[in-house]
Amino acid sequence: MKRICAALLASLMLALCACSNSEINTENSDAAAANDLSASEPETEPETTWIDTLPADVKYDGLTFLIGWSTPDPDSDECAPDIDEVTGDIVGESVHQRNLLAEEKLDISIASQKLTESWTTVLTDMKALILAGDTAYGAYDVGTWFMFQASINGLLHPLNSVETLDLSNDWWEHDLNNMIALDGKTHYMANGMINYLDDYGASCIYFNKFLCTDLGLEHPYEMVRNGEWTLDRFLEYVDLSSADLDGNGIYDEHDRYGMVENSGLLVRFLPSFGTQVVQFSESGEPIINQTEIFYDQLDRMTTGLLDRNYKPMLLRDGPLGYEKADTVFPEGRALFFGEMVRNIRGFRESMEQDFGVLPYPKYTEEQPRYYSSYNTAWGTSYGIPITNMELDRTGWILEVMCYYSMDTIYPATIEKNILTKTVRDEESSDMLRLLFENKFYELGQWGTSVYGNLLSIASSGTNNFASSMKSITKINAKEFAEVKNYYKFGN
């Protein structure tokens, strides 16, 4: 056997030598041509990025930049979490990596501190810090609603006055930031790649893929892509999904529903229709939306989905209560469930059946795009306290942090954690990208009299908005009276 192998090897070597000799001239010619070509090609210089243009003297000699934060989740430090506490958590590690890059670039140390033990009192705590002349904090990262309240209490610098901060850069969220500025000219807070909790606070509809298939319904992804995922199509699916499974004539937690939500659903559906309830005139006076389309939308919701006799709809804060109602979707007895994106991981752990993610529907196909309301208590925004006199320095630091977040926090939070690690299919990944890129800010979304009125409509199933307009307008004017003193509108 060895002799045969040796003979074959000798024959192979002779053949290779023959080929090599016959082709040597061709190889030499090709090599020479390649050398001539490479010699004639000009050397390309590496592409210059924004970070390369940062002035060389933007260094801060080991300064500690302290960020004060507050969210309803006491463990959600998205600014500078302790690495020992986030090791193994892909998002926390990405925040740490972002900070290391920014710290090295600027010669700083980034630190964070919780502003309050109770997230509901953060405005009071910020006021106390400002009145005491506190200068420890370089920036705040707090729920957007509380940041708005801080802005009309004179606690924040207008970001327009920070020359080193450019909110037109790609790493800032342009449309959302314009809405947060009340479509005016004054920015007191900003969102971008630097913070991810606003993405976690985006509203979405979860759907049971197994049940959808079992009912003979098409998964709605293509409808979304084609711009056909509308309120009408959504209601068709809801209508076809409910059933009195035990046949006792009473709908409870043991039966099947088309949609599970709570009384806050109007502040998710209305923004998905592109509707802002609280608006402002060019002089900064608060206005309640009284357009015909707005009233049509309210009527559609109250005569359909919110009708007390409409069995396919289950309100979690209705007679059944949260404890029982919250078993229905995870256990496969509801087609749709409306909530925030941050609930994905919980469903992944609790559900045996596969689920997908969708945006809330458009009102009609003519609506130009989908919108995603986001919870302004959970969703955060960055701002600069009025006691911080180092605006140029702060602007550079926030810009650099946001810039480095593009390749650290964003891919970790969105691509790896939510879109790959948590979501079970690539189609839902596409849906989440759509949600995050189309967040919609509604000032009346949380904490206002308008919010309370919309909750009342949802829980009662009665549209009394028009009849309550006089009292709503009066309260609304009082709530937002200070806006015109801080925000600029018109020309």
Region annotations inferred by a language model:
Residues A15-A18:
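C-terminal motif of bacterial Sec signal peptides marking the signal peptidase cleavage site
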Residues G68, D134-Y140, T144, L182-I205, ...:
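Extracytoplasmic/periplasmic solute-binding protein
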Residues S76-D107:
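Short, polar/charged alpha-helical segment
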Residues K105-L182:
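Extracytoplasmic "Venus flytrap"/periplasmic binding protein-like
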Residues T164-W172, M223-N226, D252, T275-D296, ...:
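Short, solvent-exposed loop/beta-turn-alpha elements that line the ligand-binding surface or hinge
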Residues L235-L240, L270, T275-P319:
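Glycine-centered hinge/linker elements that transmit conformational signals in sensory
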Residues R348-I418:
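Extracytoplasmic/periplasmic substrate-recognition and gating elements
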Residues N388-G395, S405-N491:
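Conserved C-terminal helix/tail region of periplasmic/extracytoplasmic solute-binding proteins
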